[in-house]
Design a protein with these regions (language model features):
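His/Asp/Glu-rich, glycine-adjacent segments
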Residues: 63-136
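Generic recognition of stable, solvent-exposed alpha-helical segments in well-folded globular domains
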Residues: 10, 15, 27-30, 54, ...
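Asp/Glu-centered strand-loop micro-motifs enriched in Gly/Pro and often flanked by an aromatic residue
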Residues: 1, 34, 45-46, 81-89
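N-terminal secretory/membrane-targeting segments
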Residues: 1-5, 22-25, 133-136
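Beta-strand elements within well-structured catalytic alpha/beta cores of enzymes
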Residues: 4-21, 35, 59, 100
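An acidic- and aromatic-residue-enriched active-site/binding cleft used to recognize and process polar
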Residues: 12-15, 25, 40, 46-49, ...
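Glycine-/proline-rich flexible loop or hinge segments
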Residues: 14-18, 37-43, 51-55, 73-85
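Short, structured active-site-proximal loop/turn typified by the sulfatase FGly-forming signature C/S-X-P-X-R
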Residues: 21-59, 63, 106-108
């Protein structure tokens, strides 16, 4: 079996690529610039709607909102049209780390938005933000 190279993804929510380029030109954020020079930087187009929870879910599933089922930080329950918070276990698509685990790979996933509550998989997952109660 061919050995696969490790993948490291550092996602910075809400950081526009032009701002990062300006910081690099101005000599600001040198550690981030060194990471980019050594490993490469890629920007991604946001999803529609342009909401962090939707964009991150689109990124980690490779599916659009109609396919993965998350359209925002809160939604309406189709049974009673009351507000509800979509949760990670309710997604209709698997994130890439679960797909990789099914092929025998190992993943460590830290603080990725829209991954609460964590669902079991053979790896480590520390859930990222979003609260699941409007009162909190």
């Amino acid at each position: 079996m061919k050995r696969r190279r490790p993948l490291f993804v550092l996602g910075i929510d809400g950081l526009p690529a032009p701002l990062l380029e300006r910081w690099k030109r101005e000599g600001r954020r040198p550690a981030l610039s060194r990471i980019g020079e050594r490993y490469g930087l890629r920007s991604m187009d946001s999803s529609l709607p342009e909401v962090s929870s939707v964009s991150w879910t689109t990124f980690f599933t490779g599916k659009n909102p109609g396919e993965h089922g998350l359209f925002g930080f809160y939604d309406l329950d189709p049974k009673g049209y009351t507000p509800r918070f979509p949760t990670f276990p309710g997604l209709s698509s698997k994130p890439f780390w679960e797909e990789e685990a099914a092929r025998g790979g190992r993943s460590v996933v830290l603080n990725v938005p829209s991954t609460y509550p964590a669902r079991p998989f053979p790896g480590e997952l520390v859930s990222g933000f979003v609260a699941t109660e409007m009162e909190k």
